[in-house]
Amino acid sequence: MAGKGGKGLLAAKTTAAKSAEKDKGKKAPVSRSSRAGLQFPVGRIHRQLKQRTQANGRVGATAAVYSAAILEYLTAEVLELAGNASKDLKVKRITPRHLQLAIRGDEELDTLIKGTIAGGGVIPHIHKSLINKSSKE
């Protein structure tokens, strides 16, 4: 029995060694995200664009890279502002409230993201007519 098992392992090693010799000329695969210098998955975004488009699944290769870059930039921007908001409140964890304060505090992001953020609360605001006028006099 030991002879049969040993023979099979030897044969497997030789075929693995042969395939390793063939692969020496090939380069390691490089993802499109790393080629573009992005963290967001270009391949996944490309697949989702193809699934959701009306043009029979025809999406240009650069469209996915551009979309991934835009999403990564907007995410970084929102996370930076939310991190600043959480740091101002002396908290180490970003909550939906911090995201709400960050987005509504920035004029451009506020116009871009008009949806409701669950658990975000409301933005503190006191109308000018309600502020005491006694300090003026």
Curated annotation (Swiss-Prot):
Subcellular compartments: Nucleus; Chromosome
GO cellular component: nucleosome; nucleus
InterPro entries for this protein: Histone-fold, Histone_H2A, Histone_H2A/H2B/H3, Histone_H2A_C, Histone_H2A_CS
SMART domains, alphabetized: H2A
PROSITE patterns to which the protein is assigned, alphabetical: HISTONE_H2A (PS00046)
Chief place where the protein resides: nucleus
Keyword Aminoacyl-tRNA synthetase: no
Biased composition (Low complexity): 9-18
Region feature (Disordered): 1-45
Keywords on record: Chromosome, DNA-binding, Nucleosome core, Nucleus
Subunit-level organization: The nucleosome is a histone octamer containing two molecules each of H2A, H2B, H3 and H4 assembled in one H3-H4 heterotetramer and two H2A-H2B heterodimers. The octamer wraps approximately 147 bp of DNA.
Record family assignment: Belongs to the histone H2A family.
Full protein name: Probable histone H2A variant 3
Native species: Oryza sativa subsp. japonica (Rice)
